[in-house]
């Protein structure tokens, strides 16, 4: 099984692969509106249990994102317990992504 976390550098490389992993942003809608990574799908952590099985493909790679990495790691572990084997949390969240990969993404 994959490591529970993926580094920003490793995810940046994966984005260009086919099929690219789904980027799942589990932050609140106001956070997503403040700063987001292009192509991300926003399902807030609090809505995950009611939406995951209808909206996420358990066979498709998923990278989960939040602000600093705590919520995304929690959602990653929950999804794995639900049978999603190809899911990883973006280490450091969007904060680290903005610092290390794309400084045009606002920090908050």
Where are these regions (language model features)?
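Rhodanese-like catalytic fold shared by cysteine-dependent sulfurtransferases
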Residues: 1-22, 28-61, 70-108
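Short, surface-exposed ligand- or partner-binding patches at beta-edge/loop junctions that are enriched
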Residues: 65
């Amino acid at each position: 099984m994959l490591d529970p976390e993926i580094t920003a550098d490793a995810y940046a490389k994966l984005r260009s692969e086919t099929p690219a992993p789904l980027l799942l942003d589990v932050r609140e809608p106001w956070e997503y509106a403040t700063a987001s990574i292009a192509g991300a799908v926003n399902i807030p952590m609090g809505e995950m249990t009611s939406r995951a099985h209808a909206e996420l493909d358990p066979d498709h790679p998923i990278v989960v994102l939040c602000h600093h990495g705590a919520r995304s790691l929690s959602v990653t572990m929950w999804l794995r317990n639900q049978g999603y084997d190809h899911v990883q949390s973006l280490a450091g969240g969007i904060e680290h992504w903005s610092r290390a990969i794309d400084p045009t993404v606002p920090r908050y």
